[in-house]
Amino acid sequence: GAVRDIKLPPGALQKLADVEPRLVGQTFDLPPVDPGLNSRVAGVLTGSMDDYGLAVLDLSNPAAPRYAEHRADHKQNVGSVGKLVVALALFQALADLHPQDIEARRKLLKTTLVTADTFSQTDHHTVRMFDPASRTLTRRAVRIGDQATLYEWLDWMLSPSSNSVAGMVMREAMLLRHFGAAYPVPEAQIQQFFNSTP
């Protein structure tokens, strides 16, 4: 049976082999602002337009890229970029533990069950939680006690950009780095580690 949810666009369903990076080996200077594209971008940002700095590079025609910007000089700390660093830290810890064994890395991601604790608090971003028994899909913020695989925590951090989930993934990267081959460790050992680590 199918679960009711938002249907993914066709491009999101393509396999990696179908992705063709068309700009490999090409270089170009950033084109001047395209007035038509700029006004279309401005139309999307109505209401909260001045809360954002935005740049759009339209590569639908690689021979003639188009550029639009809004508040180009606006400086802002983008939290989602930090989540990429958290993901990189976790993947590097996995690679250091299993340098030649990608399947061992995948196994840890698939089988490690992570339980939310105070590292997960608090956030307004919701995550998708699927209950296989009732076949229901809900969206809500993470709560202490929620359980999911490490793969799911990564997905929740990157897809809806959940800050609280990023805290949990940071926790797991630290635990993986500290405990190495003994990872994953029981909850009591996790609490003891963080209670005794300055």
Language-model features: where?
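Acidic/polar N-terminal loop/beta-strand segments that form early-domain functional surfaces
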Residues: 57-59, 81, 117-119
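Active-site-adjacent helix/loop patches that line small-molecule binding or acyl-intermediate pockets
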Residues: 19-41, 102-198
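Short regulatory "switch" loops immediately downstream of catalytic or recognition motifs
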Residues: 57-60, 90-99, 171-179
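Active-site SXXK
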Residues: 77-105, 114
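Beta-lactamase-like hydrolase cores
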Residues: 6-74, 97
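Extracellular structured ligand-interaction cores
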Residues: 49-51, 73-75, 79-81, 154, ...
